[in-house]
């Protein structure tokens, strides 16, 4: 089956040409990397990245940092996108094992072999369309991936409503096991925003503590900081699972490419959402 886009026309333009223009606006924005990426068609050398998932007018320039570095690091066969479940619907950890997701830029095929093996390997994961039908956190990553890679990749969506350490480790380890079994050149994307609806300075301070743990590849420490400082980061589980996966794939460090808040775009610093672009590199 083909999943229809849930947030086209809201989070990003529904018209293909307008969407391409907006993605290019994100890359060239003063908060973005400044120029368009040149995609490397060799195997991807990055094991994973972190990208935000708000409306493109707010978080798109930050996301563009992630996708520029990713594109220039090579072209993966399979992209596993881990996003939080905002709707509360469906299984607590859900993938889809067949079909495609449509965006204004075309359809992206699910890597059915990978997703099916993942459900078999990971005891907490179900094959469940309901969790994905109206969720935006994974969908908004696809147009960026389509812009830089065209139709050269397949993907696996993983929507998470569970954010505990044990679940994150189970999911992250299963992703790596399947990638190795299938010999897939795989990149893992954690889709997350950081602090929600707090003053800019307060959001920055909280988010800096969390990002320090992410770039140190410390999934347990990240969860502990989120809990201790009551950080309203939505993608805790997806980010923790991504850290687990990239460490097993040989990552030695994470690098913060860009941090900004919605206030940096809108000029309203009273109630902001934090966004970060992070890449994980092998040693």
Swiss-Prot record:
HAMAP family: MEMO1. It holds the Pfam family Memo. It comes from Methanopyrus kandleri (strain AV19 / DSM 6324 / JCM 9639 / NBRC 100938). NCBIfam families: AmmeMemoSam_B, PRK00782.1. Disulfide bonds: none annotated. This is MEMO1 family protein MK0963. InterPro entries: MEMO1_fam. Belongs to the MEMO1 family. Coiled coil: none annotated.
């Amino acid at each position: 089956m083909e999943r229809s886009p849930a947030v086209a026309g809201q989070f990003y333009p529904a018209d293909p040409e307008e969407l391409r223009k907006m993605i290019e606006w994100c890359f060239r924005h003063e908060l973005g990397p400044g120029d368009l990426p040149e995609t490397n068609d060799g195997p991807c050398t990055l094991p994973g990245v972190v990208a935000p998932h708000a409306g493109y007018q707010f978080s798109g320039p930050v996301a563009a940092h992630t996708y520029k570095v990713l594109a220039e690091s090579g072209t993966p066969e399979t992209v596993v996108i881990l996003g939080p479940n905002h709707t509360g619907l469906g299984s607590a950890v859900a993938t889809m094992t067949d079909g495609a997701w449509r965006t204004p830029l075309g359809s992206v095929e699910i890597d059915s072999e990978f997703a099916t093996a993942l459900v078999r390997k990971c005891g907490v994961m179900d094959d469940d369309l309901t969790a994905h039908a109206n969720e935006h956190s994974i969908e908004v990553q696809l147009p960026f991936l389509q812009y830089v890679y065209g139709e050269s990749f397949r993907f696996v969506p993983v929507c998470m409503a569970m954010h505990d350490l044990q679940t994150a480790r189970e999911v992250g380890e299963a992703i790596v096991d399947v990638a190795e079994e299938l010999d897939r050149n795989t990149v893992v994307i954690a889709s997350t925003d950081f602090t929600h609806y707090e003053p800019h300075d307060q959001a920055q301070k909280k988010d800096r503590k969390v990002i320090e743990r992410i770039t140190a590849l410390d999934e347990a420490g990240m969860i502990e900081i989120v809990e201790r400082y009551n950080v309203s980061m939505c993608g805790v589980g997806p980010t923790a699972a991504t850290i687990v996966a990239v460490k097993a794939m040989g990552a030695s460090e994470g690098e913060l490419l860009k941090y900004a808040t919605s206030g940096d775009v809108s000029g309203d610093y009273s109630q902001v959402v934090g966004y970060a672009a992070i890449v994980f590199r092998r040693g």
